Amino acid sequence: MSQSVESRTRIKSERYESGVIPYAKMGYWDADYVIKETDILALFRITPQPGVDPIEASAAIAGESSTATWTVVWTDLLTACDLYRAKAYRVDPVPNVADQYFAYIAYDIDLFEEGSIANLTASIIGNVFGFKAVKALRLEDMRMPVAYLKTFQGPATGLIVERERMDKFGRPFLGATVKPKLGLSGKNYGRVVYEGLKGGLDFLKDDENINSQPFMRWRERFLYSMEGVNKASASAGEIKGHYLNVTAATMEDMYERAEFSKEVGSIICMIDLVIGYTAIQSMAIWARKHDMILHLHRAGNSTYSRQKNHGMNFRVICKWMRMAGVDHIHAGTVVGKLEGDPLMIKGFYNTLLESDTDINLPQGLFFAQNWASLRKVVPVASGGIHAGQMHQLLDYLGDDVVLQFGGGTIGHPDGIQAGATANRVALESMVMARNEGRNYVAEGPQILRDAAKTCGPLQTALDLWKDISFNYTSTDTADFVETPTANI
């Protein structure tokens, strides 16, 4: 609804008296606001500048991420400005942290273009993050209404269809990243792909920064990689794949590479998060049209997701990427070399895999979310994992995940094929023990030792990496609620 005559007169009068009205008084703060089912909700962690009231800071965030500027403008009176103003409706101190606050903000759905991550982010994480009134600002979580989600296609393939295409059920997918990630010739690269797949992996993959460099151009990589895929598939009698990274400088180049990946028989292609939201959505539309699985590497996310008080939590990226339409996204390992609190990672996985999620503060989920039947995204666990951790990986991450052992395959002393076999035997022995009703978490090391009695490559892997772990205190453990999370 538009403003009343009295309200317009008051605002106009105050503007001419001072030129500036506090954001809270301009209508961007409403403690009595009744949330609509169609509202988009955002939770920000704000650190106001000294002397700035947290309610005023929250109202400023609401204003600057929707319709406001630094002063009242008379053209507000030409719009339904009451409707279009975002409303900060709740501010809570962050427990056990001084001078930080959680600000809950509601946005009317009409503020955003349908089906556009770029337009959504231009408001939610736009200029507001440089606002001087706050020392730091972090987007912790969002709730997307069903009406808005229905304007997005969601994952191009999704978990269920991918399992059917791969004919893999009842266990995680197994993969590995080609190492070294840069410098191999095309022929040697294809040999790595072949050896890994022949040894028992389901997937090999390009890494995030292999595109089309002087030592190996993209077309050469695609041809040799698919030669390895086809030979290994024929040898093993299983469907296998290799994530061909089609990331490039322009969309024209990316489409050309994606089309060629399909022509040479690939079932999956890959992009990097750094290409941007519009390019990601464009590639997701292409992948659905061409029946291709679309893998997303989250390269670049830690530049804004690791800091506790500024940037954006990775769970928000998970939500946006499910909307955008990717089929895979790297989402953490818990036990590997990369950042990841166990409960936070569980929250990421639930965001990608569940049809409905409830509020769960230890997992960092501040809002309940109905996913409006969007397909499930397969989380990918990679970075510093090896066969000796298989019981932990299965316990923390479950079946619906791609476990990628890069160094844990290619670093095996007996060769790549032996490394792949070690991982396949470790996984299948653990899944079998679980299905038999054994306490595979407590008995995990013994289960692996028993399996290694008849699998030399697994024994070698266990001997080599038995003491390898990455026990660092996580930077992303919840500080706003007590959790049982240990440093694992």
Curated annotation (Swiss-Prot):
Name of the protein in question: Ribulose bisphosphate carboxylase large chain
Binding annotation for Mg(2+): K205, D207, E208
One annotated GO molecular function: ribulose-bisphosphate carboxylase activity
Additional record remark: The basic functional RuBisCO is composed of a large chain homodimer in a 'head-to-tail' conformation. In form I RuBisCO this homodimer is arranged in a barrel-like tetramer with the small subunits forming a tetrameric 'cap' on each end of the 'barrel'.
Location of N6-carboxylysine modifications: K205
Stated family: Belongs to the RuBisCO large chain family. Type I subfamily.
Lineage: Eukaryota, Rhodophyta, Bangiophyceae, Bangiales, Bangiaceae
Active site: K179 (proton acceptor), H297 (proton acceptor)
Pfam families assigned to the protein according to its UniProt record, in alphabetical order: RuBisCO_large, RuBisCO_large_N
Catalytic reactions on record: 2 (2R)-3-phosphoglycerate + 2 H(+) = D-ribulose 1,5-bisphosphate + CO2 + H2O; D-ribulose 1,5-bisphosphate + O2 = 2-phosphoglycolate + (2R)-3-phosphoglycerate + 2 H(+)
Result when mutating T67P: In strain: U-51
Residues that, per the record, bind substrate: N127, T177, K181, R298, H330, S382
Signal peptide bounds: none
Species of provenance: Pyropia yezoensis
Note on how the cofactor is bound: Binds 1 Mg(2+) ion per subunit.
UniProt-listed InterPro entries: RuBisCO, RuBisCo_large_chain_AS, RuBisCO_lsu_C, RuBisCO_lsu_C_sf, RuBisCO_lsu_fd_N, RuBisCO_lsu_N_sf, RuBisCO_lsuI
Keywords tagged on the record: Calvin cycle, Carbon dioxide fixation, Chloroplast, Lyase, Magnesium, Metal-binding, Monooxygenase, Oxidoreductase, Photorespiration, Photosynthesis, Plastid
Gene this protein is translated from: rbcL
